[in-house]
């Protein structure tokens, strides 16, 4: 934890910090500008080790769907943040494939722990009486991210060109099928989250 915190990452452990490192600025430039900033491969590896040894409890992400033109102009002009939510699960599944994280740890850190940390009622688990928020993943589907599969209104992702070995096939929110075959069913909406106080 000391190495992680000494590098200025504090208590924020987002998916992009587990995936990208400073060499990626050469090709992606301002597209991966975020706060805290993407650090070195040593920092990324320290985060991955902290994740695998359970020093990190929660994996989170933000989704900042800035237009591509807002990400131009170099480090001083490009806005911070990137659209990450669509490909965040498959990016973390790569860590499972590489043996850095177990599938059980992934579920704990991405589902159970966030619900517990924020005291969210009836979420984060598959249990009677809980909302059926589920993702069906094909763990053995190799594919490459292309621009035409981006669902975010901003129309781009820093993941374009990346090869993944798992794919999200379906997503259910409150038991309703909301995503299948790279299409979102807009007729279903989420519900207001309730928090235990």
Residue ranges, per PLM feature:
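A conserved active-site cap/scaffold subdomain adjacent to cofactor or substrate pockets
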Residues: 25-56
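Active-site environment of divalent metal-dependent phosphoester hydrolases
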Residues: 1, 17-19, 66-68
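Single conserved hydrophobic/aromatic residue that forms the stacking wall/gate
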Residues: 2-13
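Hydrophobic faces of well-ordered beta-strands that scaffold small-molecule active sites
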Residues: 11-14, 59-61
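Phosphate-binding core of ATP-grasp and ATP-grasp-like enzymes
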Residues: 14-21, 119
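C-terminal cap of metal-dependent C-N hydrolases
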Residues: 74, 131-194
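His/Asp/Glu-enriched, well-ordered alpha-helical/loop segment
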Residues: 31, 52-59, 64-140
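A short acidic, glycine-rich active-site loop
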Residues: 32-42, 79-83, 157-163
């Amino acid at each position: 934890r000391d190495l992680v915190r000494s590098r200025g990452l504090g208590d924020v452990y987002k998916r992009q910090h587990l995936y990208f490192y400073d060499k990626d600025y050469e090709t992606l430039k301002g597209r991966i500008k975020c706060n805290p900033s993407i650090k070195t491969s040593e920092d990324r590896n320290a985060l991955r080790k902290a994740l695998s040894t359970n020093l990190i409890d929660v994996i989170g992400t933000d989704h900042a769907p800035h237009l591509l033109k807002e990400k131009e102009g170099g480090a001083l002009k490009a806005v911070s943040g990137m659209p990450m939510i669509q490909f965040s699960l498959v990016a973390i599944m790569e860590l499972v494939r590489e043996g850095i994280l177990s599938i059980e740890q992934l579920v704990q850190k991405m589902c159970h722990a966030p619900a517990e940390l924020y005291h969210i009622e009836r979420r984060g688990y598959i249990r009677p009486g809980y909302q059926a928020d589920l993702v069906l993943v094909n763990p053995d589907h190799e594919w490459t991210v292309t621009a035409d599969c981006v669902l975010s209104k901003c129309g781009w992702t820093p993941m374009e060109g990346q090869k993944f070995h798992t794919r999200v096939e379906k997503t259910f929110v409150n038991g309703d099928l909301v995503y299948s075959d790279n299409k979102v069913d807009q007729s279903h909406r989420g519900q207001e989250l309730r928090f235990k106080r």
